[in-house]
Amino acid sequence: MADRGQRRGCAPGIASALRASFQGKSRPWTQTRYWAFALLTPLVVAMVLTGCSASGTQLELAPTADRRAAVGTTSDINQQDPATLQDGGNLRLSLTDFPPNFNILHIDGNNAEVAAMMKATLPRAFIIGPDGSTTVDTNYFTSIELTRTAPQVVTYTINPEAVWSDGTPITWRDIASQIHAISGADKAFEIASSSGAERVASVTRGVDDRQAVVTFAKPYAEWRGMFAGNGMLLPASMTATPEAFNKGQLDGPGPSAGPFVVSALDRTAQRIVLTRNPRWWGARPRLDSITYLVLDDAARLPALQNNTIDATGVGTLDQLTIAARTKGISIRRAPGPSWYHFTLNGAPGSILADKALRLAIAKGIDRYTIARVAQYGLTSDPVPLNNHVFVAGQDGYQDNSGVVAYNPEQAKRELDALGWRRSGAFREKDGRQLVIRDLFYDAQSTRQFAQIAQHTLAQIGVKLELQAKSGSGFFSDYVNVGAFDIAQFGWVGDAFPLSSLTQIYASDGESNFGKIGSPQIDAAIERTLAELDPGKARALANQVDELIWAEGFSLPLTQSPGTVAVRSTLANFGATGLADLDYTAIGFMRR
């Protein structure tokens, strides 16, 4: 099954021609959503990264991570003892758009860039290592224990020094309020994900206000991820009511509790500044500040070159070549749980509401050629991602994609059988032309995916209409409201892959933007999340994935190679892989 689609892929000559036509200058990971609600004992693997530049000359980049490294094996962050770094400094990063909502639990705040920024300011329960291992973050909790299994009970004991930036102590009420808000019990809360909260029976006070006892109504396999990885804890003041939850952070974040706080917002200059939190009780951060500038995708690499920002993702060979030849810039790489895909819209009334049509069209999209073109020179063996739950390299990953393996002749037969007959270049049925709208963020590299799909679908008589949009309102105005037939964007996962099952793939999932589902998928998700044995849970998750493929839910395309161009003097920052960043340790090396 794993090889079937590869054997049916485009011939090398076709891939080479497409690659030459579509070689872009922007990274394909600009528009991303968080996949659920990851990691830190980093390693730097010194290897030689070789590739061919656009001119065919050999390019050597060293040191950097091995292009063949798997998820869960490495981070590449220039690890240094924080005590040896400069005291002070400003880390300059970029955002695609000014956040529409700073509440990362809200559907409009569930954006990878926003959440990455807020991680420096909010509590999390565990520190995640490069191998996905979890260690209690003692800045916030002195212990987190699974104290019972029948019923499942988790006890959080909060660090007595932990306080919000407004001076309010962090207590069990913050945990209780957030779990209630995102549980789905009150539909007025516009949540991005329930993240296991829907399985909680109660949250009660423990021995004192600094202890929360969480009792589950149903077992939850990924309980460690409720406030870790991509998950964070917000103050009760921001989650107590739907009004506070939905609108309390539209103009800026609420109280925080990290080593940094958001201290300045300038919508005119499109700038956000984080500075040291004066109430922070943990290790003193090396940096004075972190500044985020809103830049469109094409402006990021030039901004790195002219010393306006200090790091940016690299998504094409052209970008890699330019960045590697820029004085003072290093290339750091560690594959992470980030992946790009096509979400299909099967909502009632949409052209793809018919599952049989979705599957036929899926068989007409050559995912192997997409991978080979989009990741040419970035990985040693570009292949598509073939699982919705696990990324390649994670325990549990297997290829379940055979049901939609690229087979244009089969796709043509199925379209004929469905009554979509050729009329000239494209197909029609009952006087309606088979036109599919493809929504994507307007960058050259994201356009690669769209153009290759457009080319291969045209061969089977399907017209793909490309709809490029800017970063502003991409999710809130289009994806979230289902204004697409196919939507291209990325998911950013963490060390808790099962956490995303309900959020994305359940019939009523908060991030099921295509409104596709089935009772069988819902039941399989429930069986998976209720299984506390990790090996059995992974096997059950693959049964879920098989059902997702068979439903024509979405098409995973490529997993990010995790390549980042970083100022060479910047330490403890870069390509993290699965690992968490330690924001107190990031800094610049002494000259």
UniProtKB/Swiss-Prot annotation:
GO biological process entries: peptide transport; protein import
Localization per Swiss-Prot or TrEMBL: Periplasm
A GO term from the CC aspect: periplasmic space
Consequence when changing residue 496 to D: More than 50% loss of glutathione or bradykinin binding activity
Molecular functions (GO terms): glutathione binding; peptide binding; peptide transmembrane transporter activity
Outcome of substituting residue 491 to A: The ATPase activity of the OppABCD complex is significantly reduced. Cannot bind an endogenous nonapeptide
Highest taxon above the source species: Bacteria
Gene3D superfamilies documented for this protein: Dipeptide-binding Protein, Domain 1, Dipeptide-binding Protein, Domain 3, Periplasmic binding protein-like II
Keyword terms: Peptide transport, Periplasm, Protein transport, Transport
Signal sequence segment: none
InterPro entries recorded: Peptide/Ni-bd, SBP_5, SBP_5_dom
Pfam families: SBP_bac_5 (PF00496)
Traits of the deletion mutant: The uptake of glutathione is compromised in the oppDA knockout mutant.
Function as written in the Swiss-Prot or TrEMBL entry: Part of the ABC transporter complex OppABCD involved in the uptake of oligopeptides. Peptide-binding protein that shows broad specificity but a moderate preference for hydrophobic oligopeptides and those that are 6-16 amino acids long. Can bind the tripeptide glutathione (GSH) and the nonapeptide bradykinin. Glutathione (GSH) uptake by mycobacteria through the OppABCD system contributes to the depletion of the GSH pool in infected macrophages, which impairs the ability of the macrophage to detoxify methylglyoxal (MG) and contributes to enhanced production of inflammatory cytokines.
PANTHER family, sorted: MONOACYL PHOSPHATIDYLINOSITOL TETRAMANNOSIDE-BINDING PROTEIN LPQW-RELATED, PERIPLASMIC BINDING COMPONENT OF ABC TRANSPORTER
Protein family (similarity comment): Belongs to the bacterial solute-binding protein 5 family.
Description of how the protein assembles with itself and partners: The complex is composed of an ATP-binding protein (OppD), two transmembrane proteins (OppB and OppC) and a solute-binding protein (OppA).
Protein name: Oligopeptide-binding protein OppA
Species lineage: Bacteria, Bacillati, Actinomycetota, Actinomycetes, Mycobacteriales
Gene giving rise to this polypeptide: oppA
